[in-house]
Amino acid sequence: MKKNSLFVLVLNCGSSSVKYSLFKDDQEVLKGLKENIGLKTGEKNHQIALEKIFEEINNSGVIKGLKEIKYIGHRVVHGGEIFKKPTLINKNNLKRLKSLSYLAPLHNPFNILGIELCLKLLPSAKNYAVFDTEFYSSFKEESFLYGLPYEFYEKYSLRKYGFHGISHQYITRLTEKILKHKAKKIITCHLGAGSSITAILNGQPIDTSMGFTPLEGLIMETRCGNIDPTIPLFLIKNHGFTPDQLDEIFNKKSGFLGICGLRDFRDVLKMETKKSKLCYEMYLRSVVKTIGSYISLLNGADAIVFTAGIGEGSAKFREDVLKHFEYLGVKIDKKKNYQKKTIISSNQSKVKVLVLPTNETLMIYQEIKEKIKK
């Protein structure tokens, strides 16, 4: 008797877009994107966007009907300390999830909206939330606590949560597969508009550059990254800035944009201005310092992996980063680096260097598949 195919829909619902992928028995058979939601060039609201997505899926020919979709996986940015693994959505879990929206006010409300709309539009499917923070839930206190009064953690949940976890988890698994599980100390570098680096030991993360929010860590496209905590206090007390103004500045007007007026790293590379060169060097320095600190934490490295827009797209940046780790025995093959091969380290290198495309959608699917098998 022929076994029924497993159809899983994966959704990433953002403030102005909905990205979807439909999987059939481990294969992505359909994908699409609705963007500019709420604007003149997009759908009026998220419900209409999702209705159109379901219509596209139903008319695609890859599925007999929407009821064949038994599971829907949702990317949710923040799981707080409550959700540490993929979670089946029921009334209680939905209520608990809503209680965490204050931790990620720019993301979680829209992730939750996607869940609620799917419960309404396709009630026969089971909905799972997969969390960006989940990968870091095994952190020990010395990894996630700040040097603040301990009661601030107990009262206000102030701690490092880490983000881009779905991407770092996927890249870690893929690296282990490619290197046949010989790499125990791995540093994964997700470098794009948002950038983060994670230290992996025996398949588990032990530190990551993003913190309580995705603002901490590296300089990014429009985010400032690490700054002295007294800077916002100074600007409020002495120059009349409000917390909301600083939130806007630190998240949307800093980073590459704030330093040289350019958002796109490709433009930063092209422009031969004093400020664009400064921006490049500052970003390079922040990446090198973070990788270097994780090498110390891991007491070495078996593999360094680059992914996302900058990590995959800029051979020059990879080369400039890796020059700083020649002392560790890192040697790259320049030809392989510029040809965008999977492994760009030379045969003589003591550390494997890889360039891999991330696939958060596939990771979410795999997480759900593992969950429903149990």
Question: Where do the language-model regions lie?
Answer:
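Short glycine-rich, Thr/Ser-proximal phosphate-binding strand/loop in the N-terminal lobe
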Residues: 8-44
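Phosphate/pyrophosphate-binding loops at sites that engage ATP/ADP/AMP, CoA/4′-phosphopantetheine
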Residues: 55-70, 177-180, 291-302
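Short beta-strand-loop/turn "lid" adjacent to the catalytic site in phosphate-handling enzymes
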Residues: 57, 62-107, 126-128, 134-145
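Glycine-rich phosphate-binding loop of actin/hexokinase-like ATP-binding domains
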Residues: 138-235
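Adenine-nucleotide phosphate-binding core of ATP-dependent small-molecule kinases
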Residues: 248, 252-261, 265-298
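Glycine-rich phosphate-binding loops at beta-strand->alpha-helix junctions
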Residues: 302-325
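Glycine-rich phosphate-binding/hydrolytic loop that grips phosphoryl groups
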Residues: 333, 337-374
